[in-house]
Amino acid sequence: MTTFAYDPSLRDSTVLITGGATGIGACLVETFVAQGARVGFLDIDAGAGAALAQRLAGGHHAPLFVSADLTDIAALTRGIDAVRQHFGPIAVLLNNAANDQRHKVEDTTPESWDDAMAVNLKHQFFAAKDVAADMRQAGGGSIVNFGSVSWMLKMGGMPVYTTAKAAVQGLTRSLARDFGPFNIRVNTLVPGWVMTDKQLRLWVTDAGRADIARGQCLQQLLMPEHIARMALFLASDDSAMCTAQDFVVDGGWV
């Protein structure tokens, strides 16, 4: 695992991560467990989630995995409550879960629109709403919503996904205003094209690598660890006066 700086403000804090079984989410889980945080993570992939939790069980706090379909808000609420009951009030929320499935305008139906909004936007609002009560009682907390550079780059082939991800940044600003009086920070972490196993398997072709080389200022591949580093900053006391902001980690593409 890549070595990260240690931040004592995260040790023993309860951190909730959505979509934590694979990809960027799995890296987030591993990174925050290494910080000594109490990590609970939710994902629909029960097999991958359980395997990750077992692999990291020897840490300062063994992580808790809860299998949940986050498009089902009742299931999301139950999952959050399970983490709360196991570890205590939630201090940090990382709203990572998403699905960038490609789709065409002409193939989009009202049902597929709703499905894409549910997996990319809706759960972020309701998770933030749920944990805000914990944070208010504690005198503060950090919520990190996950966006995407896709809409900034005018990417085609996934219009509902890009719409949802653009909306995430509006949600962040609204929640930052509403939660600010309670010392709850809300920011958006905006990844570029991150080389997860899924991206490498499905879309990172030779042409895709050429696009990266042309688009990014920094000529190296963007990895999940780069996103986790920014998440650590936004979750920790080091970002105590940062809220309502977009933190882009994309190698200089936007």
Question: Where in this protein do the model-derived segments appear?
Answer:
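Alpha-helical segment proximal to the catalytic Tyr-Lys
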Residues: A133, R177-P181, A240
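Substrate-binding pocket helix/loop in short-chain dehydrogenase/reductase
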Residues: K104-V105, S112-M117, Q199, I212
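Active-site loop-to-helix junction immediately N-terminal to the catalytic Tyr of the SDR YXXXK motif
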Residues: T108, K154-T162, S174
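Active-site helix of classical SDR
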Residues: A128, A164, T172
